[in-house]
Each structure stands twice: as C-alpha cells, then as structure tokens.
Amino acid sequence: QQKGGKEGASGMNTPDELKALHEKCDAFADQIDEITNRRNASRRVAELVYKISKAQGYSEHDALLYYLVGLIYDIGFLNIDPVILRSEHITEEQFNVIKTHTSIGTNMVFFIDEKNRGLFKDGVSKHHENLDGSGYPAGLKGDEIPYIARVLRVAETYIALVSSRDYKSIKDRDSALRELYEQKSQYDQDIVKTLDDIV
C-alpha cells in the first residue's frame, strides 16, 4: 500500500496521445542530459521510476506516465547557465541558482495536456523534497509529498550515486542502497525496498 494514495492522471490517455507525449519528453530528455553533461541519466531515472511503480502495483498506464515525468523532471535546468551546471565546485550562490530549477521547470510543462499537467508539475517541482521536511523548495513532509516526487527522489539519487558525474567515486549497487536505507528521514523506505528488489 502506497503512502499518500495511488494518484495518477485524471483520465486515461489513448495510445496515440501517449506516443505523442513520449516523443516530446524524449526530445527534452536529450537536451537536459546534454546541458547537464549526464549521459542518458534522464532515461535511466525514468526506467527505474517505471519499474518501481509497476512493482508497487501501479497500472501500466500510470507507470508509463511516471516514466515520462522521469524523462523531464529536470527540465528547469534548460533555463539555467550551463557553466554553473557543469562546474565541479559550486559556490553557495550558484547552488541557490541551481535549486531554482524546480520552480523554473514547473512553468515549462505547458506542452503537457491539461489532464496530466498536475502530475508532471508535482514531479518537476517536488522531486527534491525530503520526508523530514529538509528538502526544497517548499519543505514538504511525509504524505505532503506526492508519490511521483518520492519515487523520483529515490531513483534520481540512486542513479547519481552509481554514476561518475555526480560523485567523485562511483558507488556500487550495495553501497548506494545502503546510503538510501541509512537516510530514512529523507527517502521513502517502501520505495527504497522495492528498488532493492529490482536492481
């Protein structure tokens, strides 16, 4: 049983609608990964989000939508100076600029159909919220954070931990999972356990 309920789209999409949406999100994913210098990271996150949500009992339709949100959750980076995004050492001021990608991105999902826009906004704006309220931008806690944002938080962190771009040393699967388990105040442990089962 999922915390916060099984929220999905307000209506079903036709296969053609999903295909068109997929093409748009796919194109943005390429741009996001290029500007952040994170090769194929968006798709890797999206694939984990899909697998986790399916394993947790979500429908194929909703899991596909979550996959699409996973492709563009960092879309706000497209309006941030790439020099900052690619810096190895960032200042506090630069980090504050980077943090604005959540609010910037929320205003960039206008191309999403109205019935799904709320879901995409939740993923884009809230994927850096932590269960204990220590995240940003709103400091949401627990069930205030929608499922799509909680699953993105886990998937994004795992991919970052096992990738060389975000950390000086690449962690192996077990080390990355251990870190997610240890930081239980931040990450939904039901989602972490499901991740553990599928990777």
Positions of PLM-derived features:
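Short, Lys/Arg-enriched N-terminal segments with co-localized hydrophobic residues
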Residues: 1-11
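Histidine- and acidic-residue-rich, metal-dependent catalytic cores
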Residues: 13-199
